Amino acid sequence: QYTFETHVKHHGFDPNDAIVEVTPREGEHCIRNEDILNAIQENSDSTALVLFSGINYYTGQLFDMASITKAAQSAGAKVGFDLAHAAGNVELQLHDWGADFACWCTYKYMNSGPGAIGGVFIHEKNHNNELPRFAGWWGYDKATRFKMEKGFIPMPGAEGWQLSTPALFLYAAHRAALEIFEEAHF
């Protein structure tokens, strides 16, 4: 929530006006999917981004990311998911659902340990190298990276948003965890 609030403030908006939160109905613990879809529809004229978690970490509720994606995009909004509690826990089909982007950590259900690397997904329909971004050497086109020429030429996709590389030991822990997932056919 702090990231959203400060991002909205950075762009000169009041978080109380710009952020729409969907909460459970009185006396309930889970958010009904119909309430999420209704909130998207009711705010479609002023919504640029729908950002939701894949799983509510308090209740374990798995959200219907496919229908949320469809509703958000029908309203003309981009849609992204925080998959901190979904990655490594449930099957994800981000590309097939058409989600615009997602991010996740690997230290929880992917068992990579504290401080482990994270992940990001950007749907290929959003691979626009002209988008403004903070640029780093690891996001630069691999074919010409070592020429060190002026002007940033990003790699397509999520790779083009990389700034630098994590420590190698983080990769090692993550690889070991992924090998276990592979053995389990997950």
Briefly describe each language-model feature range:
Residues Q1-D14, N56:
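Substrate-binding/gating loop at the entrance of the active-site cleft, primarily
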Residues T3, R32, Q61-D64, V90, ...:
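Residues at alpha-helix caps and immediate loop-helix transition turns in enzyme cores, especially N-
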Residues T6-H10, A39, D64-A75, Q93, ...:
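Alpha-helical structural signal in soluble globular domains
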Residues K9-N16, Q61, N128-L131:
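Proline-centered turn/helix-capping motifs that create local helix->coil transitions or kinks
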Residues P15-V20, P24-A84, G88, Y109:
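Active-site phosphate-binding strand-loop segment of PLP-dependent enzymes
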Residues G76-A77, L83, A87, L94-N111, ...:
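Conserved active-site segment immediately N-terminal to the catalytic lysine
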Residues N111-A116, F121-F186:
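Active-site C-terminal subdomain of aminotransferase-like
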